[in-house]
Amino acid sequence: MTQVSGASDVPSMGRRQFMNLLTFGSVTGVALGALYPVVNYFIPPSSGGSGGGVAAKDALGNDVVLSKFLADHNVGDRTLVQGLKGDPTYLVVESSEAIGDYGINAVCTHLGCVVPWNASENKFKCPCHGSQYDATGKVVRGPAPLSLALAHVSVTDDKVFLSPWTETDFRTGDNPWWA
């Protein structure tokens, strides 16, 4: 018959070893928590679906619904939405039933200011240094060296999506500088 002894074969963890393990776990948790935003910065945002692009967001962060958007805006309006990489992007209302198949990035190519649409002059005018762009975002007056970037606009299930523009720039006939 086997005799049961009072001593265990597994040594108990000492206080020092327990405190070292606790300290290591705490430091590791804090380090991982601090590194999470850094790692997240280098991972591009998801495309938001099956190749449809990134959903355009309004000023409140809600998805842009085409039917409501068209009801609230007039033909010829250029309205800011949150687009690719979170950049402000103009959607162009072409008719009471449709928006343009392109969006215009609102970031000035000179120093990065957000360029407002000036409806009375039918052009974009940068408030920082006076650069001007026509209604399609093509630069017409410097100091901006390049036209505003473009994005493709598509509609799926009445929601507006933006995707990168990689084809020839229809305004200049050149390859896109932003791609």
UniProtKB/Swiss-Prot annotation:
Q: Which cysteines are joined by disulfide bonds?
A: 113-128
Residues that coordinate or bind [2Fe-2S] cluster: 108, 110, 126, 129
Q: Name one GO cellular component term.
A: plasma membrane-derived thylakoid membrane
Q: Which cofactor does it need?
A: [2Fe-2S] cluster
E.C. no: 7.1.1.6
Please give the PROSITE patterns that the UniProt record associates with this protein: RIESKE
Q: Which CDD domains match?
A: Rieske_cytochrome_b6f
How does it sit in the bilayer? Single-pass membrane protein
Biological-process GO terms, alphabetical: photosynthesis
From the UniProt record, which GO molecular function terms apply? 2 iron, 2 sulfur cluster binding; electron transporter, transferring electrons within cytochrome b6/f complex of photosystem II activity; metal ion binding; monooxygenase activity; oxidoreductase activity, acting on paired donors, with incorporation or reduction of molecular oxygen; plastoquinol--plastocyanin reductase activity
Q: Which HAMAP family match?
A: Cytb6_f_Rieske (MF_01335)
Protein name as it appears in the record: Cytochrome b6-f complex iron-sulfur subunit
